UniProtKB/Swiss-Prot annotation:
Its main location: cytoplasm. SUPFAM superfamilies: ClpP/crotonase (SSF52096). Acetyl-CoA carboxylase is a heterohexamer composed of biotin carboxyl carrier protein (AccB), biotin carboxylase (AccC) and two subunits each of ACCase subunit alpha (AccA) and ACCase subunit beta (AccD). One of its GO terms (molecular function) is carboxyl- or carbamoyltransferase activity. It is found in: Cytoplasm. A zinc finger (C4-type) spans 27-49. The gene is accD. Component of the acetyl coenzyme A carboxylase (ACC) complex. Biotin carboxylase (BC) catalyzes the carboxylation of biotin on its carrier protein (BCCP) and then the CO(2) group is transferred by the transcarboxylase to acetyl-CoA to form malonyl-CoA. This is Acetyl-coenzyme A carboxylase carboxyl transferase subunit beta. It catalyses: N(6)-carboxybiotinyl-L-lysyl-[protein] + acetyl-CoA = N(6)-biotinyl-L-lysyl-[protein] + malonyl-CoA. Pfam families: Carboxyl_trans, Zn_ribbon_ACC. The lineage of its organism: Bacteria, Pseudomonadati, Pseudomonadota, Gammaproteobacteria, Enterobacterales.
Amino acid sequence: MSWIERIKSNITPTRKASIPEGVWTKCDSCGQVLYRAELERNLEVCPKCDHHMRMTARNRLHSLLDEGSLVELGSELEPKDVLKFRDSKKYKDRLASAQKETGEKDALVVMKGTLYGMPVVAAAFEFAFMGGSMGSVVGARFVRAVEQALEDNCPLICFSASGGARMQEALMSLMQMAKTSAALAKMQERGLPYISVLTDPTMGGVSASFAMLGDLNIAEPKALIGFAGPRVIEQTVREKLPPGFQRSEFLIEKGAIDMIIRRPEMRLKLASILAKLMNLPAPNPEAPREGVVVPPVPDQEPEA
């Protein structure tokens, strides 16, 4: 046996470690490779560039309300294809596909619970469900949220993320703009706070109704907020729009919104604002709250 064969016989080949799918993800803005569980702990905010990625409606509500206090409202409401609408695909098929993809029946999730011990009702849009579009069920659930806030004499918070009214429901979707706005008038009559949080994106009929009717209209950083999109506006007016047009930083500069709050700071700041509006003691930021246990980061990073 030659010397090289003797060396080769003592070499034990190693197996390549396999990384389960979904452990790592990439930031949409800076391209940084991120550990999925670490990103979830940071509320879907990139630790490198502070880009606020989209959150699911349930994750958003669970990150806002106190552990163990959440009760879902309006979950029995389901959309119906009353018009038998069809474009390139049947509406009922689009609904079935969206429900399978997201696990939600429609684009708005409503829950009541407590925020630092203070009773609140909160609603959040699921943008992955047909672009967070507003149909009759979204309108009905929002009104249910208002009614619950009135019954409990507590504030209402809504996190918007929507492309606007759902075209497959035609006038029934447009009617929700008036329906939700009329419901909010009852909150105003009672003197109960309604805080609207505009996330990326908040457009169309949602921005033209309840999303901009808050006692405070708060936005996340760099959120796209408006009625028509920038490209549509440019094609209509035949002019180039200024940089950052319709982003939350542009809107606060023009006085269209009241505040911009980073997502990791949202929970405490909302609680502080509502405590003042409701004449309640300020929340204790040191109050214990169970968090998500994040597993350790794997030693091996994914291959480029």
